Amino acid sequence: KKNDYPVDTAKRNCMLDCNVWDDEGYCDNFCKGRKAESGYCYKLKAACYCYGLPDDSPTKTSGRCNPNV
């Protein structure tokens, strides 16, 4: 298992945005939907961060986000 920023798809490599003021469990629910233990909205990046993701779950790599893929 790993702790990391989930991405929508591995090809796009875009982190999942979240509202830092009104999270309402959005990231936690998203992460649990990806079979992680939990998740939260990391305020400095305004992106979801997951704890305990399966090793094969797509996460942010060093490349740029490519929303047009």
UniProtKB/Swiss-Prot annotation:
A single GO cellular-component term on record: extracellular region
Domain LCN-type CS-alpha/beta stretches: 2-66
Entry keyword Disulfide bond: yes
Any one of the GO BP annotations: defense response
Subcellular location: Secreted
Record-linked InterPro entries: LCN-type_CS_alpha_beta_dom, Scorpion_toxin-like, Scorpion_toxin-like_sf, Scorpion_toxinL, Scorpion_toxinL/defensin
Gene3D superfamilies: Knottin, scorpion toxin-like
Major place of residence: secreted
SMART domains assigned to the protein according to its UniProt record, in alphabetical order: Knot1
Gene Ontology molecular function terms on file: sodium channel inhibitor activity; toxin activity
Tissue-wise expression: Expressed by the venom gland.
Short name of any one Pfam family annotated for the protein: Toxin_3
Annotated signal sequence range: none
UniProt entry tagged with the keyword Metal-binding: no
Keywords: Disulfide bond, Ion channel impairing toxin, Neurotoxin, Secreted, Toxin, Voltage-gated sodium channel impairing toxin
Disulfide-bonded cysteines: 14-65, 18-41, 27-48, 31-50
Family: Belongs to the long (4 C-C) scorpion toxin superfamily. Sodium channel inhibitor family.
Domain description: Has the structural arrangement of an alpha-helix connected to antiparallel beta-sheets by disulfide bonds (CS-alpha/beta).
Function: Inhibits voltage-gated sodium channels (Nav).
This protein's name: Sodium channel toxin
